[in-house]
Amino acid sequence: MSNDKAATSTNFNLTPNRERIFQELSELISHYSPHSMPEHADTHEEAAKWVTAKLEELGLDVTRHPTVDDADTIIGVKEPVGDAPTILLYSHYDVVPAQNPAVWTNDPLELDERDGRWYGRGAADCKGNVIMHLEALRMVQENGGTDLGLKVVMEGSEELGGEDGLGKLIDANPELFTADVIFIGDGGNVAVGIPTLTTHLRGGAQLRFKVDTLEGPVHSGGWGGAAPDAAHALIRIIDSFFDEHGRTTIEGVDTTAKWEGDPYDRETFRKDARVLDGVQLLGTVDDEPADMVWARPAITVIGFTSVPVEDATNIVNPTAEAQFNLRVPAPQSAAEVAKKVEEQIRARAPWGAKVEVSITGVNEPFSTDPNGPAVQHFGKCLQDAYGAEHLTVVGTGGSIPLTVTLQKHFPDAEFALYGVADPAANIHGVDESVDPTEIEHVAIAEAEFLLTYGK
């Protein structure tokens, strides 16, 4: 690997061991760990034991804390020397299900190297970040250790817990997580080799709504044209949330904000989002992709139910149902915007159609100031590790509810969100992968920070 600048910039020998990284990531991936799936409880526990053992090998005081969603959060602690600050390093060892392994190029539970990338479930989200933290901590040990306090937090139910187990553990025992600087290793770079910090996460909610118009189906030949079609009514409601350019519009909510950080190039966005040739991006020429995905609320129709095409018959549909995924940026409130969406659904129902709406999964957006001394120092460490002159600062449309909970309890802490993923990683999808140089470079940056911050 080429990181001479990183290896010499702090007079430390920061040299990741790629063979060890591959071996450990292989082992952790082999312990299949989707949460909330009883048939995989044994291998989820194997992953927890593996992480616990590795943290103990690093000399940390390790404890396991059960959460209300029947997972364990693993916490490894090193006390600070004197009045040195404490740094919290977070990642999670659970994964999303691998779906149908037959559609993967290789077994998703066997780390496979192809064309310079490593493939397997969790390679980037988030077991690659677990390994990154471990490698950084080893390099710190190899260079004499750090006076900083450490709290290494590994969650077991980030993806499918559903009950915010870690959030409730933080609420009940905030002292376990007290830190001056909080590093969230659950993100990634805008591209391989481009050091990136994420400062904004959109919050959001799920809205499921049903429209009823008839007591039951009736023949379209006898009544179609005058009898109100529930599917038609549902389409009318959905269409009210989008203008002629496809932009989300919510009555009473500002959907015109501009992103103030680094831009998201249109062609790069098209490639990352896998937009088909000839298909336009939403918005006008004045709407940048970064505005649309990082700075504004957005609604995506993630489910629509009427009658499947293969079961279609000549009837007027009496009922239809849809689900919105709502994303909301800071400083707006996800709960308040979700309520506005509910009000619009009800107000826009045509013909007196009966409407039922439920709101679930509300999580608030997160934003952080990257100009604090710790994050500024870490940004320089990232630039050192990559030999880069510029640090890219972006937002993301995803949500990590943990960040909001930690910020609520520790409003004076500095936050950095970063990681080993990149747009080619295809996290949550088939053939998830990681570029091993990302694990190496981010580990170098983290190690450099832990060895030099406050000195």
Swiss-Prot record:
GO terms for biological process: proteolysis. One of its GO terms (molecular function) is metal ion binding. It catalyses: an S-substituted L-cysteinylglycine + H2O = an S-substituted L-cysteine + glycine; S-(1-hydroxy-3-methylhexan-3-yl)-L-cysteinylglycine + H2O = S-(1-hydroxy-3-methylhexan-3-yl)-L-cysteine + glycine; S-benzyl-L-cysteinylglycine + H2O = S-benzyl-L-cysteine + glycine. Zn(2+) 1 binds at residues 92, 125. Signal peptide: none annotated. The keyword S-adenosyl-L-methionine does not apply. Its cofactor is Zn(2+). Zn(2+) 2 binds at residues 125, 159, 163, 428. Pfam families: M20_dimer, Peptidase_M20. InterPro entries: ArgE/DapE_CS, Bact_exopeptidase_dim_dom, Cyt/Met_Dipeptidase, Peptidase_M20, Peptidase_M20_dimer. SUPFAM superfamilies: Bacterial exopeptidase dimerisation domain, Zn-dependent exopeptidases. The active site is at residues 94, 158. Its EC number is 3.4.13.23. Keywords: Aminopeptidase, Cobalt, Dipeptidase, Hydrolase, Metal-binding, Protease, Zinc. It is an enzyme of class 3 (hydrolase). Metallopeptidase that hydrolyzes the Cys-Gly bond of Cys-Gly-S-conjugates. Involved in the formation of the human body odorant 3-methyl-3-sulfanylhexan-1-ol (3M3SH) from odorless axilla secretions. Catalyzes the hydrolysis of the Cys-Gly bond of the Cys-Gly-S-conjugate of 3M3SH, a key precursor secreted by apocrine glands in human axilla skin. The Cys-S-conjugate obtained is then cleaved by the Cys-S-conjugate beta-lyase MetC, which finally releases 3M3SH. Belongs to the peptidase M20F family. This is Cysteinylglycine-S-conjugate dipeptidase. It comes from Corynebacterium striatum. The gene is tpdA.
